[in-house]
């Protein structure tokens, strides 16, 4: 065995010392951050308490109309079981079924994301501010997916009775699990310190601003008195408005040629969430009795205020070199599109300020899948479904 030279021993000792110093500094930073967040959390609790009171007061002012709509929900076709319909075919709700087939054709798995090049970028190309920003974005995504899936499993998938919509929600639950796995893998890959990982995985409790988003979401979607239509709007606002700024910030990294694994997974997840948001709008359109447009507007604009505040105070986009005013405008642009989809008028009346988000923002346009030909769809799924519904003759039918 070769004898260790004094210079190598000194170098190893220095390396160990640097690692220990680095860990010590990280622990100090985390403790400082926790203390700052404890102070923020105390202030936020007071704000959330006031927000909850204002929320109840606002809904009380619409009590009579909402009570009538709640009673009328008993007659909603989407929410009432058709005991004579025991099998899926023949399809009754064709638009809803096509939404399911689009989701099915977009299936992917976490194993398809190559993170090997990201490690180099994370350690050598990204600065401390950028690493801080991305780690917090991933923490929010991981926390939000838990809320989304819980709502799907406990509420929407059991409340909606038509088989076409149940098919979509069943698939969405599975794909949200894949999103959750992907976010966890990303955090595990980039964040090597166990204490920091724990801090990020518990973001709802450790990062007050993410906790505020969660509280707002639960206030709307887990309220027993909330109308189904109101909860659809809130759910779409989570996946549409709350995710919009974070998606845009990661696409900004792609524009700079960084983090290919992260940005590719972001493309896939952004596309999925777009389908999920569109589906919420589609179900809303099928409701016979819709919520008051004023309440729809309030839900969406509340989400915008929280999202804009999040990127102003908690996670300044300047850390990535992005313009904060343009980010605010982008969130408003996304919100306007959502309001129009729900039958409301535009509230903000702004243009999309991010050219790199143009094709992503427009429904049906997905030209950013460079790793796959033809929209990353499983071969023939959509074409087969469309032909079957149209009654088209095909040469592979059984005779």
Swiss-Prot record:
MF terms (GO), sorted A to Z: ferrous iron binding; molecular adaptor activity; protein heterodimerization activity; ribonucleoside-diphosphate reductase activity, thioredoxin disulfide as acceptor; zinc ion binding
Record keywords: Deoxyribonucleotide synthesis, Iron, Metal-binding, Nucleus, Oxidoreductase, Phosphoprotein
Cofactor: binding comment: Binds 2 iron ions per subunit.
Family: Belongs to the ribonucleoside diphosphate reductase small chain family.
Highest classification ranks of the organism: Eukaryota, Fungi, Dikarya, Ascomycota, Saccharomycotina
UniProt modified residues of type Phosphoserine: 15, 24, 41
SUPFAM superfamilies assigned to the protein according to its UniProt record, in alphabetical order: Ferritin-like
Record-linked CDD domains: RNRR2
Pfam families: Ribonuc_red_sm
Function: Provides the precursors necessary for DNA synthesis. Catalyzes the biosynthesis of deoxyribonucleotides from the corresponding ribonucleotides. RNR2 provides the diiron-tyrosyl radical center.
Note: Present with 538 molecules/cell in log phase SD medium.
Subcellular location: Nucleus
Binding residue positions for Fe cation 2: 176, 239, 273, 276
Catalytic residues, chain numbering: 183
A GO CC annotation given for this chain: ribonucleoside-diphosphate reductase complex
EC code(s) of this entry: 1.17.4.1
Reactions accelerated catalytically: a 2'-deoxyribonucleoside 5'-diphosphate + [thioredoxin]-disulfide + H2O = a ribonucleoside 5'-diphosphate + [thioredoxin]-dithiol
Temperature dependence (free text): Optimum temperature is 30 degrees Celsius.
Cofactor: Fe cation
Protein name: Ribonucleoside-diphosphate reductase small chain 1
Family matches, as InterPro entries: Ferritin-like_SF, RNR-like, RNR_small, RNR_small_AS, RNR_small_fam
Binding site for Fe cation 1: 145, 176, 179
